[in-house]
Amino acid sequence: MMIPKELVKGSLKSIVLKLLAENKRMYGYEITQKVEELSEGKIKLTFGALYPILHKLESDGIVITEAEVINNRNRIYYMLTEKGNASAKERIRELEEFLQTIKILLNPQSGLENVFAKS
């Protein structure tokens, strides 16, 4: 079952940052394939969704690009800057906190058990 686009949309930037943090250097098609692979086909990241994110990250100084010619084709690789590495860590932390909060909202009783378990 595919995850609805509306649920994925707000998390795409975090997903891209996480992949770049783990893989150091990736090109667009590679990112789309990795998302599909890791999500077991539940998330399909389109180029129309990916490239605006990558371009915004680049204009914000979070990623830099490197062009390489492979089989007579220009391939653009994306890499995190130092600022990008810090941003990736922060975005991932925020997303994890958000997901934990959603989990509590969906199952309030479970959330209370977790709060008491930490005490």
Which residues make up each language-model segment?
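Amphipathic alpha-helical dimerization/coiled-coil segments
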Residues: 86-119
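Basic, amphipathic "hinge/linker" alpha-helix immediately C-terminal to the N-terminal HTH DNA-binding motif
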Residues: 70-92
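Intrinsically disordered, low-complexity serine/threonine- and proline-rich regulatory segments
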Residues: 1-10, 91
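N-terminal helix-turn-helix DNA-binding core of bacterial DNA-binding proteins
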Residues: 6-49
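Glycine-centered, phosphate/nucleic-acid-interacting loop/turn motifs that mediate DNA/RNA or nucleotide
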Residues: 61
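Short beta-strand "wing" residues that participate in macromolecule-binding interfaces
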Residues: 65
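Basic amphipathic alpha-helical segments that dock to polyanions
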Residues: 50-57
